[in-house]
């Protein structure tokens, strides 16, 4: 019994443990304790566990997360004995190139074994591959500085471990004292933000020391293959074209320029650049469009190459042999500027070898300008008279006479046949001046049609071109033919496709030179703008508007003076038309009757007062019942009797207002009988007189 009582006591105590003691249940706020106490207990417990787990997680993150992430990415290989991490495989570089292949793997792996711990069990395949990588980079460095400058920013986290593995080659390339392994990587592993800042030091020193001699260029096929593998990220210009590389390449380009210009049959020298030539597998890359065509320093090379191959516009006819061209000698400043433009490090990234891919050898007549030119007589505006006289003798009518006739006659002359066409030469002026050998100069043949009488619009465009001194000096050559004082302005052929945009007559596909790639959208925009400019030049829209305005003002001022009677007639017609329309309108009374026109408020009040006054007057004059009986107006006074009736609710259910069906039948019968007796009808139609259904 005691055991049961003890067990019962235990059972009674167990459920009462979580609840409050019975003394507290008597208080007012016992219910609040039930609600809030478990909530407080849970919050306190959860905060303790959260703090413990957060500490554990922070400890794990600070120690292991960087290494795990790097191992997952493939940047590190886990070494259990040593704290330093070794890169596992060579990832693609940031600028889109692959790293260089190892030169001799057996020596590198052996050298790595000597540097690392002696108790490590054999080289792993991955670690062998990755540790060979820095050795190969350091050994190939004097031969391929391009690859060295790109390999140096590869491993942002593993740069601290790469340095002690190969102290000798890196110290040869960059004067930098390597640290031992225990100083670089202590036993406590460092997070990412502490290891990473060491990396730009290597890149800057390696990139600043490394220079690229032009005679020791690495094989370009490997780099071009890496280009085709990863074309997503373009190479960064400060890495691929460093200042030292461009300086040495510019010096070599100047030397080859000066040597090739003296030789007439040599091809056009192109400055040496990092970009690989297009291989047989890859299609030729279209060059980007230059920013400013006139001021580009590489346009000189293009213009010289274009001068070599004779370009003829579309539809040009064959011309007689070319006379020697007299041109201004190129100033020494222009020559020095041209050579200096190829040299400095701010070279635009569109070299001439991309713009001129074929680069045909120029004939002896179009050889390059020697650096020291003998002085040439100044430019004369008229061609030799011998050629002009030959052409005039070929046609029956002399050319200057036809020009005088064309200028004097107001109508254009009819076109003659091909035998009477005057063919002349257009002498080309390049920005760099003519290329001479002896006294003969090769220029572009252009046929000139017969001169017509220019319209006013053409005169304006010619005056604009002749008045501007810069355009007349640089782009035009004035030709005086015979004794005529009139000036024919002929625009010269500009280098590249600038004139094609302005004229719109010569297309890129018709020219024999290299195809100059242009974006279609930009070409359309240029055509639109040039067309708009030509339209504005041709048509003076302001004068047309002003003339039209003056004509309209004159017509307005002359009209009333000229036709007063007609104006009066028009006014009368309008008046009669308005009167007819007004007569067809409904009147105000009709609109009021149709409730369309609302009456005025004052009129409505006055009308109500009038109605009230009339009614009161009639009621006041109304005779009484006695007067009507006396005047014998009321003759049925014997059965008319007036009784005072009490007001009652007829809607109420009263017994005297309730009719039974028998009462209703009796009423109907009485009415039918009354009607049949009151009306004298035929016997056959008597049933029509029934008032109610019986």
UniProtKB/Swiss-Prot annotation:
<feature type="compositionally biased region" description="Pro residues">
    <location>
        <begin position="318"/>
        <end position="327"/>
    </location>
</feature>
<feature type="compositionally biased region" description="Basic and acidic residues">
    <location>
        <begin position="46"/>
        <end position="72"/>
    </location>
</feature>
<dbReference type="GO" id="GO:0048484">
    <property type="term" value="P:enteric nervous system development"/>
</dbReference>
<dbReference type="GO" id="GO:0030027">
    <property type="term" value="C:lamellipodium"/>
</dbReference>
<keyword id="KW-0524">Neurogenesis</keyword>
<dbReference type="GO" id="GO:0001755">
    <property type="term" value="P:neural crest cell migration"/>
</dbReference>
<dbReference type="GO" id="GO:0003779">
    <property type="term" value="F:actin binding"/>
</dbReference>
<keyword id="KW-0963">Cytoplasm</keyword>
<dbReference type="GO" id="GO:0043085">
    <property type="term" value="P:positive regulation of catalytic activity"/>
</dbReference>
<feature type="compositionally biased region" description="Acidic residues">
    <location>
        <begin position="499"/>
        <end position="511"/>
    </location>
</feature>
<dbReference type="GO" id="GO:0030036">
    <property type="term" value="P:actin cytoskeleton organization"/>
</dbReference>
<feature type="compositionally biased region" description="Pro residues">
    <location>
        <begin position="372"/>
        <end position="381"/>
    </location>
</feature>
<dbReference type="GO" id="GO:0008157">
    <property type="term" value="F:protein phosphatase 1 binding"/>
</dbReference>
<dbReference type="GO" id="GO:0061386">
    <property type="term" value="P:closure of optic fissure"/>
</dbReference>
<keyword id="KW-0966">Cell projection</keyword>
<dbReference type="GO" id="GO:0001843">
    <property type="term" value="P:neural tube closure"/>
</dbReference>
<feature type="repeat" description="RPEL 3">
    <location>
        <begin position="613"/>
        <end position="638"/>
    </location>
</feature>
<dbReference type="GO" id="GO:2001045">
    <property type="term" value="P:negative regulation of integrin-mediated signaling pathway"/>
</dbReference>
<protein>
    <recommendedName>
        <fullName>Phosphatase and actin regulator 4-A</fullName>
    </recommendedName>
</protein>
<dbReference type="GO" id="GO:0072542">
    <property type="term" value="F:protein phosphatase activator activity"/>
</dbReference>
<feature type="region of interest" description="Disordered">
    <location>
        <begin position="192"/>
        <end position="403"/>
    </location>
</feature>
<feature type="repeat" description="RPEL 2">
    <location>
        <begin position="576"/>
        <end position="601"/>
    </location>
</feature>
<feature type="compositionally biased region" description="Acidic residues">
    <location>
        <begin position="519"/>
        <end position="529"/>
    </location>
</feature>
<dbReference type="GO" id="GO:0005737">
    <property type="term" value="C:cytoplasm"/>
</dbReference>
<dbReference type="InterPro" id="IPR004018">
    <property type="entry name" value="RPEL_repeat"/>
</dbReference>
<dbReference type="Pfam" id="PF02755">
    <property type="entry name" value="RPEL"/>
</dbReference>
<feature type="compositionally biased region" description="Polar residues">
    <location>
        <begin position="240"/>
        <end position="267"/>
    </location>
</feature>
<comment type="function">
    <text>Regulator of protein phosphatase 1 (PP1) required for neural tube and optic fissure closure, and enteric neural crest cell (ENCCs) migration during development. Acts as an activator of PP1. During neural tube closure, localizes to the ventral neural tube and activates PP1, leading to down-regulate cell proliferation within cranial neural tissue and the neural retina. Also acts as a regulator of migration of enteric neural crest cells (ENCCs) by activating PP1, leading to repression of the integrin signaling through the rho/rock pathway.</text>
</comment>
<feature type="compositionally biased region" description="Acidic residues">
    <location>
        <begin position="455"/>
        <end position="467"/>
    </location>
</feature>
<feature type="compositionally biased region" description="Low complexity">
    <location>
        <begin position="300"/>
        <end position="317"/>
    </location>
</feature>
<dbReference type="GO" id="GO:0051726">
    <property type="term" value="P:regulation of cell cycle"/>
</dbReference>
<comment type="similarity">
    <text>Belongs to the phosphatase and actin regulator family.</text>
</comment>
<feature type="repeat" description="RPEL 1">
    <location>
        <begin position="55"/>
        <end position="80"/>
    </location>
</feature>
<keyword id="KW-0217">Developmental protein</keyword>
<feature type="region of interest" description="Disordered">
    <location>
        <begin position="450"/>
        <end position="572"/>
    </location>
</feature>
<feature type="region of interest" description="Disordered">
    <location>
        <begin position="426"/>
        <end position="445"/>
    </location>
</feature>
<dbReference type="GO" id="GO:0007266">
    <property type="term" value="P:Rho protein signal transduction"/>
</dbReference>
<keyword id="KW-0009">Actin-binding</keyword>
<feature type="region of interest" description="Disordered">
    <location>
        <begin position="1"/>
        <end position="29"/>
    </location>
</feature>
<feature type="region of interest" description="Disordered">
    <location>
        <begin position="42"/>
        <end position="169"/>
    </location>
</feature>
<feature type="compositionally biased region" description="Basic and acidic residues">
    <location>
        <begin position="1"/>
        <end position="13"/>
    </location>
</feature>
<comment type="subunit">
    <text>Binds ppp1ca and actin.</text>
</comment>
């Amino acid at each position: 019994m005691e055991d049961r009582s003890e067990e019962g006591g235990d059972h009674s105590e167990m459920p009462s443990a979580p609840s409050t003691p019975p003394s507290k249940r008597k208080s007012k706020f016992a219910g609040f304790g039930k609600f809030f106490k478990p909530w407080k207990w849970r919050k306190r417990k959860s905060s303790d566990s959260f703090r413990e787990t957060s500490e554990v997680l922070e400890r794990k993150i600070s120690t292991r997360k960087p290494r795990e992430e790097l191992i997952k990415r493939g940047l590190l290989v886990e070494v259990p004995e040593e704290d330093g991490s070794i890169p596992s495989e060579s990832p693609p570089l940031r600028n889109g190139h692959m790293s260089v292949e190892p030169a001799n793997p057996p020596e590198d792996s052996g050298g790595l074994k000597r540097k690392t711990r002696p108790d490590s069990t054999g080289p792993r395949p991955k670690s062998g591959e990755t540790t060979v990588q820095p050795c190969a980079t350091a050994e190939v460095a004097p031969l391929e500085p391009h690859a060295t400058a790109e390999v140096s920013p590869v491993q942002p986290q593993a740069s601290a471990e790469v340095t002690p593995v190969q102290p000798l080659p890196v110290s040869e390339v960059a004067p930098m004292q390597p640290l031992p392994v225990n100083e670089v990587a202590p036993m406590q592993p460092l997070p990412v933000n502490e290891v990473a800042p060491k990396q730009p030091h290597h890149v800057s020193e390696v990139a600043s020391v490394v220079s690229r001699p032009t005679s020791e260029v690495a094989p370009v096929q490997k780099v071009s293959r890496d280009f085709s593998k990863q074309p997503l990220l373009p190479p960064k210009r400060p890495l691929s074209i460093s200042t030292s590389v461009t300086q040495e390449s510019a010096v070599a380009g100047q030397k080859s320029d000066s040597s090739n210009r003296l030789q007439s049959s040599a091809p056009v020298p192109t400055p040496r650049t990092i970009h690989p030539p297009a291989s047989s597998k890859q299609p030729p890359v279209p060059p980007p469009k230059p920013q400013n065509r006139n001021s580009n320093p590489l346009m000189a090379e293009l213009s010289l190459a274009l001068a070599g191959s004779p370009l003829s516009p579309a539809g040009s006819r064959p011309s007689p042999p070319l006379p020697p061209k007299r041109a201004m000698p190129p100033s020494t400043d222009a020559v020095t500027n041209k050579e200096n433009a190829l040299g400095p490090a701010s070279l635009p990234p569109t070299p001439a070898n991309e713009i001129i891919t074929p680069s045909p050898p120029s004939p002896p007549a179009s050889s390059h300008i020697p650096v020291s030119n003998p002085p040439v007589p100044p430019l004369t505006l008229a061609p030799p008279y011998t050629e002009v006289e030959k052409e005039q003798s070929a046609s029956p009518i002399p050319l200057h006479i036809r020009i005088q006739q064309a200028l004097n006659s107001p109508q254009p002359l009819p076109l003659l046949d091909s035998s009477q066409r005057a063919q002349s030469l257009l002498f080309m002026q390049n920005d760099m001046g003519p290329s001479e050998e002896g006294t003969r100069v090769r220029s572009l043949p252009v046929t000139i049609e017969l001169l017509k009488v220019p319209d006013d619009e053409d005169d304006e465009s010619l005056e604009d071109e002749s008045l501007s001194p810069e355009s007349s000096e640089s782009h035009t050559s004035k030709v005086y033919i015979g004794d005529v004082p009139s000036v024919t302005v002929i625009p010269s052929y500009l280098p590249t496709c600038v004139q094609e945009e302005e004229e719109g007559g010569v297309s890129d596909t018709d020219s024999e030179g290299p195809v100059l790639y242009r974006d279609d959208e930009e070409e359309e925009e240029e055509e639109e703008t040039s067309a708009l400019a030509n339209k504005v030049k041709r048509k003076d829209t302001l004068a047309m508007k002003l003339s039209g305005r003056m004509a309209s003002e004159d017509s307005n001022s002359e009209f009333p003076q000229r036709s007063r009677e007609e104006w009066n007639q028009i006014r009368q017609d309008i008046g009669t038309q308005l009167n007819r329309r007004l007569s067809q309108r409904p009147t105000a009374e009709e609109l009021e009757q149709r409730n369309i026109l609302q009456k005025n408020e004052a009129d409505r009040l006055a009308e109500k007062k009038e109605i009230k006054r009339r009614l009161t007057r009639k009621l006041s004059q109304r005779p009484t019942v006695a007067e009507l009986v006396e005047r014998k107006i009321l003759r049925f006074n014997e059965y008319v009797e007036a009784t005072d009736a009490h007001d009652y609710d007829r809607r109420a259910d009263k017994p005297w207002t309730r009719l039974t069906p028998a009462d209703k039948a009796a009423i109907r019968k009485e009415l039918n009988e009354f009607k049949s007796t009151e009306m004298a009808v035929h016997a056959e139609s008597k049933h029509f007189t029934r008032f109610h259904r019986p």
